[in-house]
Every structure is written in structure tokens, then in C-alpha cells.
């Protein structure tokens, strides 16, 4: 059970806390009124930076003002204005904006860090923008301009069409204090820019002009761009493409994508597939491997002889070529209609071996060729007048050779009848005579008058 006596120490503790806070505030005031020399001495003795661990910033809260009722002295405000550092860590924190803070006083750590920040020769330490920097009097800040821009500024300030290298050096050192105190290697960079940059042109000195060295001027072609700062980093402007050309390229790219997605089939391939399906549906007993090989050979021969079909159209007596492929043309299918159907080849072969099947009986398997007109060296020959030549011509044409010519025909006809028969009564055959014996023939091998011996034999 809790008693009221257990709650009595709480107010007493709160009073003791207020006394400690007041004591700390009094000590802080004594530190503020002390001289900076004492602060530096204490820092040298301690040689520690307590800006992160010090709790002296607690005195800046309003609770201290409510308890003590004291106000800051004008001297503290002068120290704050002279130092660009915040009075406390919370005063410089953006997250503390809007908090009820009193005009603070700099802490010991922040008060002693002011000389270190003010000694840094940088824009951040001084809190100035580049436009507010006086480059003529500030030797610590380098001008934010490229060497090409500095050369162009010197040429524009001279009010002359051409300027010497020494004048460029003089103008840069007069207007920018940084280059007066910097290492003189920047002059080499100026010379390299004049020699390598295409914006500057070297003008030779005339003979009657006094002085030494040549002159330099800005190329009129690049003068406007250089003055506008386009060549500050030597970057060319982006290439402008005609809108019409952009639209055309975009349309071509879309068309290419559509073509790549859709497979195109030529009409020849479609017709070949259609013929193949018709032939396979008409004949059910065809060999797929044979059909595939035949299709390939027909395709190759069709592409190879496409240019040679035209010159032979005027020739007569041409017989269509027979093919073992199921891909038959319509006229061939009509001529060979009697061969359609399923045949028992084993039974046919057995009948032929037994003599039961006669190939001479019945209708012929192939259609009878019609009488055709023959032209040899411009002379008309009817089939009745030249039966042998007509037979040779038909056999030669059935062999499938489309390159048949007259020389082949004449040679074949000559072999059929190389010479005409001579009447045997007008010519004596010595070797073929049956009256001469073998002994008489051997007698001819011995010496003597051969002519007399032959006459006796005859």
C-alpha cells in the first residue's frame, strides 16, 4: 500500500534540480564574461573538443530565462554577429526551426572555433556566392572560367581585331589576382589553347609592324558560340535532325518489326504445296523418301533450267518427260489413267515367269505417238519416206534430252545404214570364198611370186 510519504521526495528532488540548473547557468555567465585568451588557454590545457559531449547548450532554453530572469548582454550579440557560427547545435539545425528559442549566446566550443573557420580561403567558409567575389583582389579563389573563355574575354576587352600573347597574359593578371600569385604554369595552358583550339586563328606579323611574335584573333565562324559559352568545355551542340527524317526512320523501323514478326510465303511455295497434297491424295502407295528426293530434284532442276526453257519452245515433236514422282502434271495423269490403282506386283511377276502373261497382248501401256512432221536441213520428210529416221528421232526424244540437234540425228541415221550393199556378182570375195583351203593360205607365207600364187587361187 502506497503512502503519502513516498511521494514527498519528488518535490524535493525537483527543487534540487532547479538549484543545479541555476548553478550551471551562473557558471556559464562567468565563462561568457571571461576573455578569449582564457578560453584559448583552457583549450590548450585540455586539448579536447567537447562540442559533441558538452551540455552547455541546455542554458539556451526558455526554462533558464524563466528561472533566472536574466538577459544576455550586448557584448554577446556582438560576438554572435562577428562569428558566422550558430550559437548552439540546435540553432544551426534545420529541424529546430519553429522551436521557442531565445537569442542565444555562443558556447565555449563554438566561440573558440570561429578563428579556424575564418582562416579557410574558400567560398563555403566565407559564405559568399561566386558572383559576390572580387577576383581582382582575392588571391585565394580561382575564377570559374576556362582558359578559352579567359582568352576570349581578353580579346573582347582589347577592342582590337588581333592581340598578342603578352597582352593576353597582362589582361588576365590585371583582372584576376589569383593568376598573379599562382604558379606560372597556367601560361602554358593559355598557349596550348591558342594552338589547339579551332576557335582561335594565328595572324602573322607584317614586316612593317614593330615588335616580335604573331597575333591571335577569334575565328568569325565560332565567335558567337564562344562568346555565349558554348565552348567552355569544348562540347559541340547536339545535332538537330529534320522532323520529316525522324518520322520516316520511325516508320521504317515499325515496318521492319512487322515483317520480322510475320512470315512471308511466296506464291510458288504455296502452289508447290498444293500440287504435293493433290498428288499424295491421289496415290496412297507412294514412298515418302522417294517423293522428298524427287521434290528436291525438281526444285533444283526448275531453278537451273528456268532460263533455258524459252529457246526450245519452237521445236516440234517434243515428248513430255516421264517422272516416277507422285507429283504428276495433269496431262500426264490423263495419259496414264490406265496405270492408276493398286497392283499386285508379286502376282504379275509370277505370271511373267510362268509364261502366263503376254506383254504383246492388250492395249499398250503408253499412248501411241502421233505422226509428226520432220524437218532436216530445210527439207520436209514424211514418216512414210523415212521410217528409220523417224524411229531414231522418236527414240532419241523419248530419252528426255531437250538439247537434241540435227548432228545427233544424222550420226544416228548413219550408224543404222553406214553404206549401201554392193552386188556380189560384180565383186570377188577372196577371204570369204569356200574354195580356198587352209593349206593354200599357208603357202602364201613362203617366198615366191605372190601375185602368181594369188592368180592360181582365184
Curated annotation (Swiss-Prot):
<feature type="DNA-binding region" description="Fork-head">
    <location>
        <begin position="142"/>
        <end position="236"/>
    </location>
</feature>
<dbReference type="InterPro" id="IPR036388">
    <property type="entry name" value="WH-like_DNA-bd_sf"/>
</dbReference>
<dbReference type="GO" id="GO:0009611">
    <property type="term" value="P:response to wounding"/>
</dbReference>
<keyword id="KW-0970">Cilium biogenesis/degradation</keyword>
<keyword id="KW-0539">Nucleus</keyword>
<dbReference type="InterPro" id="IPR018122">
    <property type="entry name" value="TF_fork_head_CS_1"/>
</dbReference>
<dbReference type="GO" id="GO:0000978">
    <property type="term" value="F:RNA polymerase II cis-regulatory region sequence-specific DNA binding"/>
</dbReference>
<keyword id="KW-0805">Transcription regulation</keyword>
<dbReference type="InterPro" id="IPR036390">
    <property type="entry name" value="WH_DNA-bd_sf"/>
</dbReference>
<keyword id="KW-0804">Transcription</keyword>
<dbReference type="GO" id="GO:0060271">
    <property type="term" value="P:cilium assembly"/>
</dbReference>
<dbReference type="InterPro" id="IPR047513">
    <property type="entry name" value="FOXJ1"/>
</dbReference>
<protein>
    <recommendedName>
        <fullName>Forkhead box protein J1-A</fullName>
    </recommendedName>
</protein>
<keyword id="KW-0010">Activator</keyword>
<dbReference type="InterPro" id="IPR001766">
    <property type="entry name" value="Fork_head_dom"/>
</dbReference>
<comment type="similarity">
    <text>Belongs to the FOXJ1 family.</text>
</comment>
<dbReference type="GO" id="GO:0000981">
    <property type="term" value="F:DNA-binding transcription factor activity, RNA polymerase II-specific"/>
</dbReference>
<dbReference type="GO" id="GO:0005576">
    <property type="term" value="C:extracellular region"/>
</dbReference>
<dbReference type="InterPro" id="IPR030456">
    <property type="entry name" value="TF_fork_head_CS_2"/>
</dbReference>
<feature type="compositionally biased region" description="Polar residues">
    <location>
        <begin position="68"/>
        <end position="78"/>
    </location>
</feature>
<feature type="region of interest" description="Disordered">
    <location>
        <begin position="305"/>
        <end position="324"/>
    </location>
</feature>
<dbReference type="InterPro" id="IPR047512">
    <property type="entry name" value="FH_FOXJ1"/>
</dbReference>
<feature type="compositionally biased region" description="Basic residues">
    <location>
        <begin position="305"/>
        <end position="321"/>
    </location>
</feature>
<dbReference type="GO" id="GO:0043565">
    <property type="term" value="F:sequence-specific DNA binding"/>
</dbReference>
<dbReference type="GO" id="GO:0007368">
    <property type="term" value="P:determination of left/right symmetry"/>
</dbReference>
<comment type="function">
    <text>Key transcription factor required for motile ciliogenesis. Activates genes essential for motile cilia formation and function. Its activity is sufficient for ectopic development of cilia that resemble motile cilia.</text>
</comment>
<keyword id="KW-0238">DNA-binding</keyword>
<dbReference type="Pfam" id="PF00250">
    <property type="entry name" value="Forkhead"/>
</dbReference>
<dbReference type="GO" id="GO:0070121">
    <property type="term" value="P:Kupffer's vesicle development"/>
</dbReference>
<dbReference type="GO" id="GO:0060296">
    <property type="term" value="P:regulation of cilium beat frequency involved in ciliary motility"/>
</dbReference>
<dbReference type="GO" id="GO:0006357">
    <property type="term" value="P:regulation of transcription by RNA polymerase II"/>
</dbReference>
<feature type="region of interest" description="Disordered">
    <location>
        <begin position="68"/>
        <end position="99"/>
    </location>
</feature>
<dbReference type="GO" id="GO:0003351">
    <property type="term" value="P:epithelial cilium movement involved in extracellular fluid movement"/>
</dbReference>
<dbReference type="GO" id="GO:0001947">
    <property type="term" value="P:heart looping"/>
</dbReference>
<dbReference type="GO" id="GO:0090660">
    <property type="term" value="P:cerebrospinal fluid circulation"/>
</dbReference>
<dbReference type="GO" id="GO:0005634">
    <property type="term" value="C:nucleus"/>
</dbReference>
<dbReference type="GO" id="GO:0003146">
    <property type="term" value="P:heart jogging"/>
</dbReference>
Amino acid at each position: 500500500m502506497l503512502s503519502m510519504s513516498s511521494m514527498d521526495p519528488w518535490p524535493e528532488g525537483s527543487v534540487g534540480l532547479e538549484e543545479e540548473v541555476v548553478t550551471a547557468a551562473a557558471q556559464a555567465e562567468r565563462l561568457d564574461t571571461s576573455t578569449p585568451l582564457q578560453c584559448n588557454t583552457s583549450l590548450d590545457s585540455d586539448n579536447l573538443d567537447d562540442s559533441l559531449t558538452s551540455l552547455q547548450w541546455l542554458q539556451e532554453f526558455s526554462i533558464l530565462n524563466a528561472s533566472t530572469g536574466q538577459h544576455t548582454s550586448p557584448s554577446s550579440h556582438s560576438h554572435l554577429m562577428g562569428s558566422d557560427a550558430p550559437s548552439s547545435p540546435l540553432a544551426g539545425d534545420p529541424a529546430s526551426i519553429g522551436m521557442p528559442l531565445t537569442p542565444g549566446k555562443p558556447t565555449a566550443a563554438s566561440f573558440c572555433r570561429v578563428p579556424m573557420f575564418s582562416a579557410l580561403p574558400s567560398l563555403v567558409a566565407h559564405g559568399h556566392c561566386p558572383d559576390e567575389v572580387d577576383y581582382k583582389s582575392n588571391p585565394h579563389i580561382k575564377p570559374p572560367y576556362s582558359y578559352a573563355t579567359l582568352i576570349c574575354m581578353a580579346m573582347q576587352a582589347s577592342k582590337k581585331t588581333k592581340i598578342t600573347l603578352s597582352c593576353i597574359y597582362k589582361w588576365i593578371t590585371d583582372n584576376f589576382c589569383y593568376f598573379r600569385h599562382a604558379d606560372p604554369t597556367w601560361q602554358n595552358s593559355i598557349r596550348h589553347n591558342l594552338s589547339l583550339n579551332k576557335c582561335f586563328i594565328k595572324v602573322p606579323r607584317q614586316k612593317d609592324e614593330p615588335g616580335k611574335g604573331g597575333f591571335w584573333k577569334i575565328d568569325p565562324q565560332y565567335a558567337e558560340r564562344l562568346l555565349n559559352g558554348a565552348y567552355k568545355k569544348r562540347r559541340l551542340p547536339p545535332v538537330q535532325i529534320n522532323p520529316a527524317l525522324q518520322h520516316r526512320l520511325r516508320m521504317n523501323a515499325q515496318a521492319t518489326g512487322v515483317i520480322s514478326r510475320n512470315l512471308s510465303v511466296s506464291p510458288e511455295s504455296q502452289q508447290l504445296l498444293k500440287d504435293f497434297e493433290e498428288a499424295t491424295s491421289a496415290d496412297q502407295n507412294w514412298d515418302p523418301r522417294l517423293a522428298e528426293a524427287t521434290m528436291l530434284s525438281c526444285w533444283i532442276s526448275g531453278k537451273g533450267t528456268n532460263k533455258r526453257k524459252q529457246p526450245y519452245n519452237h521445236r516440234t515433236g517434243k515428248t513430255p518427260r516421264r517422272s516416277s514422282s507422285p507429283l504428276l502434271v495433269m496431262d500426264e495423269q490423263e495419259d496414264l489413267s490406265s496405270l492408276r490403282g493398286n497392283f499386285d506386283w508379286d502376282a504379275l511377276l509370277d505370271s511373267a515367269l510362268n509364261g502366263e502373261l503376254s506383254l504383246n497382248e492388250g492395249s499398250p501401256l503408253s499412248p501411241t505417238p502421233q505422226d509428226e512432221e520432220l524437218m532436216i536441213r530445210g527439207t520436209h520428210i514424211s514418216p512414210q519416206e523415212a521410217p528409220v529416221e523417224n524411229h531414231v528421232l522418236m527414240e532419241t526424244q523419248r530419252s528426255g534430252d531437250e538439247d537434241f540437234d540435227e548432228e545427233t540425228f544424222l550420226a544416228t541415221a548413219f550408224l543404222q545404214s553406214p553404206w549401201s550393199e554392193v552386188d556380189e556378182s560384180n565383186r570377188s570375195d577372196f577371204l570369204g570364198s569356200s574354195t580356198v583351203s587352209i593349206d593354200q593360205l599357208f603357202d602364201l607365207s613362203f617366198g615366191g611370186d605372190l601375185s602368181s600364187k594369188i592368180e592360181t587361187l582365184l
